[in-house]
């Protein structure tokens, strides 16, 4: 299993790449180590059949993401952000007949999604009701921007006791 440290180091490398040429950069990086990164993606990602099964579950909400998983804040123009989000949305519409109302920012910290990206998502309120970022913490009365709601990124470092800490904070 990939440790949190290794995950964060790989994440750091990815975030430093030119986002519009990310796939070329990753291909060069992983090919240098003879790693088939698409095989790992196929192993870990949901199949469209699995998406259809989850779609039938009452306790499951399937949300949207982007097409390429770019660091949105590093994209040169807000139109690039909107294109990424819309393309990801259209994939879900076409492949799974899904019309998600929740969006999750790739990476999701303030370094990868900030006011420009929140505003871009809020301009798509005909599709989305809210968007979440991985900045940790519960939704409280301080979380007033529905296109910048916090979520907890779970890793093997999170224990049940860690999660209970969030339960003690007032949630709206």
Language model regions located:
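Metal-dependent polysaccharide deacetylase catalytic core of the NodB/CE4 family, i.e.
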Residues: 1-111, 149
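C-terminal active-site subregion of NodB/CE4 polysaccharide deacetylases
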Residues: 67, 73-172
